[in-house]
């Protein structure tokens, strides 16, 4: 018997391999369903400027969008934003944009904001944002090119053009924050909420 005690299946509103891995490693059975939302459109319409607030808004919208079609289920939405000062980064569209992002991040400190929201019957019942502070080492053009050659198309799937669970770890000299936040899901506060609602057995 698994840990999930909800009457309806737990749903992750994401196909992120890292988020799916984190939930699976925590012993939770779940269904992964992509949230069909216009992230850029929602962000623009909101007129929010804080990376933290934008991440939380998108996590909420993902959870609510999937929840609307799955009554009774608890739906987890998550989003991650990267901020270099006041500048917000999006996933790079290709290699050239990935290189430009890495040039800006190299030798500098930035923040990863990981937001999570849980929806039930279309309403948000839990939300949280965790922050990781990241310092990327100074790198030459040759080093950045070598990284992009090795990482391939995977760089376009993450903000900042790096995946810390893979080759991206080579880019950093200092990381402050928990592993789950860096991978895009504040797992400890999420589990605490599920436990408080008696939705998990442990």
UniProtKB/Swiss-Prot annotation:
Gene Ontology BP annotations:
nucleotide metabolic process
Give the reactions, separated by semicolons, that this protein catalyses.
Answer: a ribonucleoside 5'-triphosphate + H2O = a ribonucleoside 5'-phosphate + diphosphate + H(+); a 2'-deoxyribonucleoside 5'-triphosphate + H2O = a 2'-deoxyribonucleoside 5'-phosphate + diphosphate + H(+)
SUPFAM superfamilies given in the database record? ITPase-like
Give the enzyme's EC designation: 3.6.1.9
**Major localization listed first in the record, in broad terms:** cytoplasm
PANTHER family noted in UniProt: BIFUNCTIONAL DTTP/UTP PYROPHOSPHATASE/METHYLTRANSFERASE PROTEIN-RELATED, BIFUNCTIONAL DTTP_UTP PYROPHOSPHATASE_METHYLTRANSFERASE PROTEIN-RELATED
HAMAP family recorded:
Maf
Q: Spell out the family assignment given in the record's similarity comment.
A: Belongs to the Maf family.
Quote the protein name from its UniProt record.
Answer: Nucleoside triphosphate pyrophosphatase
